[in-house]
């Protein structure tokens, strides 16, 4: 099918910028597409009178033609009244929902502005605004954006809490533009958060909000106490106040899991990354020499053991979701094995089973556990093996030389010779 047989949709609205170069047809005689609003026919058009498409009701025979909205009673306020309680027969379910949604747009737009400036509101419009008020402003705006979801949605089961009036979301967030003229209910003021969020007639909602508000208030108080405790903590390595460092990214504590000495995260990580000392010295605290398995980064200083255990649990749970860079989704080998805190998983998401540690007996008789045997382990062990001092080696060579000279000397039958200086 050629594109010239398809009418340009932009030309229909007078906004085609291609002109004669357009690949689609600009001839309305060959193709007359339907400009009827399909959302209006479903009863979910959120634009109302501002819609650019034709609002035509479907005929009773199922055809595409019908009377436009202004002839059916939707063109003005009087037409709206005829559409709601029209004498031409009761409206269907879709027709009723359509009229309610069209009137919602008017209630949210023109009617409330008129009432703010003291204009007399029609009694019929007042009844419609009370009966057809949406549950929230967001719901009224989103109406018509997902027509299929609206058609398939089942009506909610009416309960005791759903019959209560809805709280105004703008008043709950701090300020409502309509104030006392607002259709929605303004809640009571909460003493903790200072917002109008307490429903006057729903005790369950009040208790739930007060409980949530108190929990948030306690969390904020704990953060305030932790910030106050961290104000004067000095790093034991760089001797600077951690929270007063010039670089904001350096204002973090490196909390050791086994001691309570204060270090900034950058200094303690630099200490533990050095290769000058043995592994035991690197993992120990620079002050008390207590070995700590890992360092927990924290914005606030934690000193209590219970709080530290909670922080360690949070740290482990967060780290366990990150992929291990040494394991590399099965392509590499992690030197920590089953003790690694990071995630060991393959590309398909399955977790790798931890390797069983293997025992190795060194030449000195020491037994150590290792996950994998590599050539580099033997080279590293040989380099770290202690070398005897040179004076002891010279003494051994001197003893061997003296023993050799004695064994290679003359027999006892001959005359004895005095020992030389070399011997």
Swiss-Prot record:
<protein>
    <recommendedName>
        <fullName>E3 ubiquitin-protein ligase makorin-2</fullName>
        <ecNumber>2.3.2.27</ecNumber>
    </recommendedName>
</protein>
<feature type="zinc finger region" description="C3H1-type 3">
    <location>
        <begin position="162"/>
        <end position="189"/>
    </location>
</feature>
<keyword id="KW-0804">Transcription</keyword>
<dbReference type="InterPro" id="IPR000571">
    <property type="entry name" value="Znf_CCCH"/>
</dbReference>
<dbReference type="GO" id="GO:0005634">
    <property type="term" value="C:nucleus"/>
</dbReference>
<dbReference type="InterPro" id="IPR036855">
    <property type="entry name" value="Znf_CCCH_sf"/>
</dbReference>
<dbReference type="InterPro" id="IPR013083">
    <property type="entry name" value="Znf_RING/FYVE/PHD"/>
</dbReference>
<comment type="pathway">
    <text>Protein modification; protein ubiquitination.</text>
</comment>
<keyword id="KW-0479">Metal-binding</keyword>
<keyword id="KW-0539">Nucleus</keyword>
<keyword id="KW-0863">Zinc-finger</keyword>
<feature type="region of interest" description="Disordered">
    <location>
        <begin position="59"/>
        <end position="90"/>
    </location>
</feature>
<dbReference type="GO" id="GO:0000209">
    <property type="term" value="P:protein polyubiquitination"/>
</dbReference>
<keyword id="KW-0963">Cytoplasm</keyword>
<dbReference type="InterPro" id="IPR017907">
    <property type="entry name" value="Znf_RING_CS"/>
</dbReference>
<keyword id="KW-0217">Developmental protein</keyword>
<dbReference type="GO" id="GO:0005737">
    <property type="term" value="C:cytoplasm"/>
</dbReference>
<comment type="function">
    <text>E3 ubiquitin ligase catalyzing the covalent attachment of ubiquitin moieties onto substrate proteins. Inhibits neurogenesis and axis formation during embryonic development by modulating the phosphatidylinositol 3-kinase (PI3K) pathway. Acts downstream of PI3K and akt1 to up-regulate gsk3b mRNA expression.</text>
</comment>
<keyword id="KW-0833">Ubl conjugation pathway</keyword>
<feature type="zinc finger region" description="C3H1-type 1">
    <location>
        <begin position="2"/>
        <end position="29"/>
    </location>
</feature>
<dbReference type="GO" id="GO:0030154">
    <property type="term" value="P:cell differentiation"/>
</dbReference>
<dbReference type="InterPro" id="IPR045072">
    <property type="entry name" value="MKRN-like"/>
</dbReference>
<feature type="compositionally biased region" description="Gly residues">
    <location>
        <begin position="61"/>
        <end position="90"/>
    </location>
</feature>
<dbReference type="GO" id="GO:0007399">
    <property type="term" value="P:nervous system development"/>
</dbReference>
<keyword id="KW-0677">Repeat</keyword>
<keyword id="KW-0221">Differentiation</keyword>
<dbReference type="InterPro" id="IPR001841">
    <property type="entry name" value="Znf_RING"/>
</dbReference>
<feature type="zinc finger region" description="C3H1-type 4">
    <location>
        <begin position="318"/>
        <end position="347"/>
    </location>
</feature>
<dbReference type="GO" id="GO:0061630">
    <property type="term" value="F:ubiquitin protein ligase activity"/>
</dbReference>
<dbReference type="Pfam" id="PF14608">
    <property type="entry name" value="zf-CCCH_2"/>
</dbReference>
<feature type="zinc finger region" description="C3H1-type 2">
    <location>
        <begin position="31"/>
        <end position="58"/>
    </location>
</feature>
<keyword id="KW-0808">Transferase</keyword>
<dbReference type="Pfam" id="PF00642">
    <property type="entry name" value="zf-CCCH"/>
</dbReference>
<keyword id="KW-0524">Neurogenesis</keyword>
<keyword id="KW-0805">Transcription regulation</keyword>
<feature type="region of interest" description="Makorin-type Cys-His">
    <location>
        <begin position="190"/>
        <end position="219"/>
    </location>
</feature>
<keyword id="KW-0862">Zinc</keyword>
<feature type="zinc finger region" description="RING-type">
    <location>
        <begin position="235"/>
        <end position="289"/>
    </location>
</feature>
<dbReference type="GO" id="GO:0008270">
    <property type="term" value="F:zinc ion binding"/>
</dbReference>
